[in-house]
Amino acid sequence: MPFKHALCNEIYKDWDFREACKSIRSFGYTGIEIAHFTLADEPQSISQEKRREYRQIMQDEDLTFVGLHWVMVAPPGLHVTTPDTALREKSWDHIRHLIDLCADLGPDGVMVFGSPLQRRSTGGSTREEATKRFVDGLAAVAPQAESRGVTILPEALSPQQSDVLQSLDEAAEIVRQIGSPAVQTMFDSHNAVDEVEPHDKLIERHFDLI
């Protein structure tokens, strides 16, 4: 079975959306992964009319909407594991808005949750405390994601990027802990360079969650 290829659209940030889709398709890609800040910093500011327009453009240009990524880059200042309760709740509200945007842009979308700067421990928190807040936040938004047909993918990142979820084993552990079909994980060949086990072994062990 041949792989399908999608392109992340942040390289087209200042382009007209239709022209960006035309360009992506012209290079042979069949899918598009959207960074929401290319549309608006705050997803809730995107009207339903614009969401329908974006969805129709992707259909017109024969591109499959894969999902969203770079979910915490904008607006600035967000952080999902901070001990600051007000900021943490604001940040998870942002994720809730993104879930709705993702569902409105196309069916069966995924949200790749990398964003190392906005999830790593901060404010004097330990790695364990930050990880617990991350798990609690994901568990809290999972019912909404499930009801909207969106799958959130917490991504394992190298220790140089974040101290929260540094391996596929750790990502799989929290996915199983949450126990929602709307929270799975992913295998990223770039971010897997620091894994200590062969990649094929990791994929075999966690294939049901990837």
Locations of regions flagged by a protein language model:
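Active-site acidic/histidine proton-transfer and metal-coordination neighborhood
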Residues: 18-19, 57-61, 77-185, 194
